């Protein structure tokens, strides 16, 4: 074959023929990727260049030889150069074929093996009824039971994208509805509430807000505390000179320096509620005792760094004006602190001691000296509290109590009901007995049935009183059914569907919230009965009731498994 001719030999013709039949001839004889071919080509080129340089050097070193010998040496050089060009061209063609194969392997996303069997056949599109040739990339429509032409198959892909977006949008909507249900926000929010949410969203631009007004401050504080956005910068929004009430619901990111600023900027505070104020130290509380002289309502939740001596100092300075006091989540409050509360806070009306590590019978007995108490909450104490200490307190101040919470006092028995609450607490409106697992159904039903209460209970929590059952539920309804607004029966596994049906049929004109979670007898039929027969009922909690599946049209139904 002439070196100047570009006509391919038999191999190229065979390659073209095999390529027309869809067969890659280069892949049959070579089992290495294109990169290896390039490396081998580079090596062969270097070898040939060395071979070609040999006759040239011979010609330069032997200039005295005749021209025939020189011509004999130069002819192979020309042939080898042509051969080298042909090899380069052949390898370039083969590399191009390999690149095309590689590209085709990466672009087979729409390839169909089902269409491969019918490739080349003529058919009519199942969608537009036009005639077309089936290719390996043609799509088969299961809904229309036929092959689709190229335009119709592209349209089917375009239609699938909005369907996917619609499904994602529906899933997101379901999540938002579930979150709103948990937050008890099922109605259309007011414009004022929407504005407050916008302010909370851009709370970091605090300097651009100006004067918002004290009325909406509490709502904004709740929202940004829920978002964990309350910090040293955003807390300044709530501090002003003429402010008399301040409630911060998450102070975990507020340092001691910012806690100092509360007393500096708001010296006229009368109500101060600080939740999760774990960074409060002795110096901060001492500063409050000296500068916040008008305090009457105080709540410190989680101030575990404040020492007992500083608590005593605070109550000595500010206790005479205190009307409401709440202390929770601390291990620094001992008997001496409780004694200071009793001695230095004679006007105390409301007292809440929750999750106090060293609260025991000795501390509780001292509370009998708070003669003016109307609300008493002793919840989840760290020490052991028995019936005797609670009975001593109730015998002294029980007649004046409107609110009593003994939640988490797990060692209390029926004696508290029979000798304390029943005979001594005739003015109670709010009673919380959550977690009192030693109460029995027979004794509790007798106490509630014979309880001579003046106006009836408005809220009652029997959550996790595991031994109570149908008798207690009936006695409670007979005693206070006409005044009950909130009833919590969460976890009372001995309550049957008969007792639930009794609640449905019993007249409860004031009932707004009912918790029947983890009661096996609760089902969809009872939900419908509550919805139709209890017009005042607004919220129904059904956590763990796996027979409640259907949604409610009117009630705020919280806790469905499919929610």
From Swiss-Prot:
Bias-annotated ranges (Polar residues): 39-59
Keyword annotations from UniProtKB, A to Z: DNA damage, DNA repair, Nucleus
Gene Ontology biological-process entries: nucleotide-excision repair
PANTHER family (UniProt xref): PARTNER OF PAIRED, ISOFORM B-RELATED
Record's subcellular location: Nucleus
Full protein name: DNA repair protein rhp7
Database matches in InterPro entries: Leu-rich_rpt_Cys-con_subtyp, LRR_dom_sf, Znf_Tbcl_Rhp7
Native organism: Schizosaccharomyces pombe (strain 972 / ATCC 24843) (Fission yeast)
Keyword DNA damage: yes
